[in-house]
Curated annotation (Swiss-Prot):
Pathway: Amino-acid biosynthesis; L-isoleucine biosynthesis; L-isoleucine from 2-oxobutanoate: step 2/4; Amino-acid biosynthesis; L-valine biosynthesis; L-valine from pyruvate: step 2/4
Gene Ontology terms, MF aspect: ketol-acid reductoisomerase activity; magnesium ion binding; NADP binding
EC number annotated for this UniProt entry: 1.1.1.86
Residue span(s) of domain KARI C-terminal knotted: 183-328
Residues annotated for Mg(2+) 1 binding in this entry: D191, E195
Family indicated by similarity: Belongs to the ketol-acid reductoisomerase family.
Protein name: Ketol-acid reductoisomerase (NADP(+))
UniProt KW keywords: Amino-acid biosynthesis, Branched-chain amino acid biosynthesis, Magnesium, Metal-binding, NADP, Oxidoreductase
One GO cellular component term: cytosol
Length: 332
């Protein structure tokens, strides 16, 4: 079972005199910076000068500067820029500012695990990865609670890397919920697999397959949309709240029997085999290589697929039906 750390394991005083630099002020960056500041820690923010993040961080009362200047000043540097831009940011603006005693932190392990960023041996390299969106990390903190995080240590030059990372986790409030120990490899590989096989790739493909099956059988696209996409939220919310068993206890016996007997015919042995292949491509680095080369080439495949998917009938039907739902209009 996983090792989980709580408040008793976290000593905020270890970083009270250190200057923390946050790279990026987007979804996660703003939450980290504000939670750390509210915990009494010294925080500076690095963004693209004049950009939206720069303006927002300035408006929120932070000292904002370019990444290179921040890298020279900060004792702890947390990389919260998009994964695809981190390697260039590191090479151009951070690497030269690193000195013994500093710690480089990440919220996702991709660039370290796949060698896109190779820090010098004299710095600590750690990860604190909150398991929630940035807005939720901030919200629960202000309510006096916290969000769970993952912690990993890739490099322990100081001999105190884990303790310092735990202190950082306390600064963003994760000590109030729990900090689960992992590795850069495990976090990266499971995160990518979850995205590709279940949360994004698996779910969207399943939804579209169900929608297309009904439409091709002569059912109205609008009804197919409701049954295969719209109602998905009802089921996911139940699983999110209490797990699979809780969801099953909340649906009809007819739905439950169909779940037990037909579900395994949809997700069958062939699916398991394909999932294993997808995991293998993540583990051996071939997916990472493919994605890195795709970015270097200007994303031709990505852009083509994105355009093609946006033209799927389910998007047209969904837009029409969502326009009928006043509660969705209010959220936009």
């Amino acid at each position: 079972m996983a090792v989980i750390y709580y408040d008793k394991d976290c000593d905020l005083s270890l970083i009270e005199k250190k200057l923390i630099g946050i790279v990026g002020y987007g979804a996660q960056g703003h939450a980290h910076a504000q939670n750390l500041r509210d915990s009494g820690l010294k925080v500076i923010v690095a963004c693209v000068e004049g950009g939206r993040g720069w303006k927002k961080a300035t408006a929120d009362g932070f000292e904002v500067m370019c990444v290179a200047e921040m890298a020279k000043k900060a004792d702890i540097i947390m990389m919260l820029a998009p994964d695809t831009s981190q390697a260039k940011i590191y090479k151009d603006s951070i690497e030269q500012g690193l000195k013994p005693g500093k710690m480089l932190m990440f919220a996702h392990g991709f660039n370290i695990h796949y060698g896109q960023i190779v820090p010098p041996s004299f710095v600590d390299v750690t990860m604190i990865a909150p398991k929630c969106p940035g807005y939720m990390l901030r919200q629960v903190f202000t309510e006096g609670a916290g969000a769970p995080s993952l912690i990993a240590v890739e490099q322990d030059a100081s001999g105190k890397a884990k303790e310092l990372a735990l202190a950082y986790a306390k600064g963003i409030g994760s000590n109030r919920a729990g900090i689960l120990e992992t590795t850069f490899a495990e976090e990266t590989e499971t995160d990518l697999f979850g995205e590709q096989a279940v949360l994004c790739g698996g779910t969207t493909s399943l939804v579209k397959a169900g929608f297309e099956t009904l439409v091709e059988a002569g059912y109205q696209p609008e009804v197919a949309y409701f049954e295969c996409l719209h109602e998905l939220k009802l089921i996911v919310d139940l699983m999110y709240q209490g797990g699979i068993a809780y969801m099953r206890d909340s649906i009809s016996d007819t739905a439950k029997y169909g779940d037990f007997t037909r579900g395994p015919r949809v997700i069958n042995e062939d699916t398991y085999e394909t999932m294993g292949e997808i995991l293998g491509e993540i583990q051996d680095g071939s997916f990472a290589k493919e994605w890195i080369l795709e970015n270097q080439a200007g994303r031709p495949v990505y852009n083509s697929l994105r355009r093609m998917e946006s033209e799927h009938l389910i998007e047209e039907v969904g837009a029409e039906l969502r326009s009928m739902m006043s509660w969705l209009k209010k959220k936009r």
